[in-house]
């Protein structure tokens, strides 16, 4: 099965299934000398792990990461870093009823048609469970970028279903299970998700992820533009159906004289492009937004077919998120960090000796 690696010089490869023994990752390309402990990774894993609130899946996994290689005496050695998280709370019996049927809206049908066989327990490899390793790997990238450049990567939820957050206070984001910066929106989010669970359905979400203090010059035109690789990384996250960079789809209704991000000797006058021009970072804050679809794992009966191609009904059991966007923020942060780390190394490899004609202008 191909497609389990991302990045060129900073390369992350993951493996593992929802109800298997555990999850693993190999993170290659980490420069030597970075002080790194399991606790550095655990902070973000704890933000993503299931069972932490009544608004997410009640599967309880400690997601305790183990560093099994690539770190010696508390520092990275420059060799591949091996990471392991063991699964502890699988309930495979919950999925016996779908062994012969396909859950509509899931990867069951396509995995079976592509591979001729599938692990039906919790979705197997297609489960969002695999994103735990992305978060662990992304935490390494976040730490390196923060220490070397002061890069700050952080995200927040802007919409749950039809409820929209109207303001952003970063101090509020870690204080609620929705990663929302609008304290007034949180009760509305809570009421909506509670109602959806009672109704046996689910809803989508929208998140914004920012990367501040990214140096100018990262990105490899034309096919590996920074925004192209960011979009690729974000679209690889389960349930993501749309990605916006900067003003995103709103540009269709804008005018050039309003949105060309004019610049002066003192800095840029706007950031409609989201910190990327011509596929290269401009030094401004990189702004990314993603939209996640409602999970199809709901307790409302639906129509499907079985392995004999016979019509049947299906009722999804198991422990699922009524809104997958609730826990997606640290995942999206991790994917942005992985892409930025890769592009830093690629830029350094080719352009380390380049002397720009003048110092970068201020964002």
From Swiss-Prot:
Residue numbers binding FMN: 125-127, 238-239, 278, 293-297, 319
Class in the EC hierarchy, top level: lyase
GO molecular-function terms, A-Z: chorismate synthase activity; FMN binding
Keywords in alphabetical order: Amino-acid biosynthesis, Aromatic amino acid biosynthesis, FAD, Flavoprotein, FMN, Lyase, NADP
Residues annotated as binding NADP(+): 48
Pathway: Metabolic intermediate biosynthesis; chorismate biosynthesis; chorismate from D-erythrose 4-phosphate and phosphoenolpyruvate: step 7/7
PROSITE patterns named among the record's database cross-references: CHORISMATE_SYNTHASE_1, CHORISMATE_SYNTHASE_2, CHORISMATE_SYNTHASE_3
Cofactor: how bound: Reduced FMN (FMNH(2)).
Domain of life, source organism: Bacteria
Functional description taken from the UniProt entry: This reaction introduces a second double bond into the aromatic ring system.
Source organism: Acinetobacter baumannii (strain AYE)
Catalytic activity: 5-O-(1-carboxyvinyl)-3-phosphoshikimate = chorismate + phosphate
Family the UniProt entry places it in: Belongs to the chorismate synthase family.
Record-level GO cellular component terms: cytosol
Protein name (database record): Chorismate synthase
Pfam families associated with the record: Chorismate_synt
Assembly, per entry: Homotetramer.
NCBIfam families registered for this protein in UniProt: aroC, PRK05382.1
């Amino acid at each position: 099965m191909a497609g389990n690696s991302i990045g060129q010089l900073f390369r992350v490869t993951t493996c593992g299934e929802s109800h298997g023994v555990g999850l693993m990752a190999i993170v290659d390309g980490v420069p030597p000398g970075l002080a790194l402990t399991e606790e550095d990774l655990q902070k973000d894993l704890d933000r993503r792990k299931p069972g932490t609130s009544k608004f997410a899946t009640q599967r309880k996994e400690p997601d305790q990461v183990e560093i099994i290689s690539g770190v010696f005496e508390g520092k990275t050695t420059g060799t591949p870093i091996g990471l392991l998280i063991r699964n502890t709370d699988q309930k495979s019996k919950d999925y016996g009823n779908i062994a012969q049927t396909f859950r509509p809206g899931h990867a069951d049908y396509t995995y079976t048609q592509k591979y001729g066989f599938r692990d039906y327990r919790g979705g197997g490899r297609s489960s969002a469970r695999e994103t735990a390793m992305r978060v662990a790997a992304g935490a390494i990238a976040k730490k390196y970028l923060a220490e070397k450049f002061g890069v700050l990567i952080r995200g927040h939820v802007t919409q749950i279903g039809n409820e929209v957050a109207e303001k952003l206070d970063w101090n509020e984001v870690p204080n609620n299970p929705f990663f929302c910066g609008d304290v007034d929106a949180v009760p509305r989010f809570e009421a909506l998700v509670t109602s959806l669970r009672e109704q046996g359905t689910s809803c989508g979400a929208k998140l914004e992820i920012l990367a501040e203090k990214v140096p100018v010059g990262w990105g490899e035109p034309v096919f590996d533009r920074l925004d192209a690789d960011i979009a690729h990384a974000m679209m690889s996250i389960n349930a993501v159906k749309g990605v916006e960079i900067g003003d995103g789809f709103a540009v269709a209704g804008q005018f050039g004289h309003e949105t060309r991000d004019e610049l002066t000797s003192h800095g840029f006058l706007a950031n409609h492009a989201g910190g990327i021009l011509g596929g290269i970072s401009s030094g401004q804050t990189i702004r990314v937004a993603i939209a996640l679809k409602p999970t199809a794992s709901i307790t409302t009966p639906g129509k499907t077919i079985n392995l004999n191609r016979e019509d049947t009904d299906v009722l999804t059991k198991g422990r699922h998120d009524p809104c997958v966007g609730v826990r997606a923020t640290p995942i999206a942060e991790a994917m942005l960090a992985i892409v930025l780390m890769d592009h830093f190394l690629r830029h350094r490899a080719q352009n380390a000796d380049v002397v720009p004609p003048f110092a970068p202008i201020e964002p």
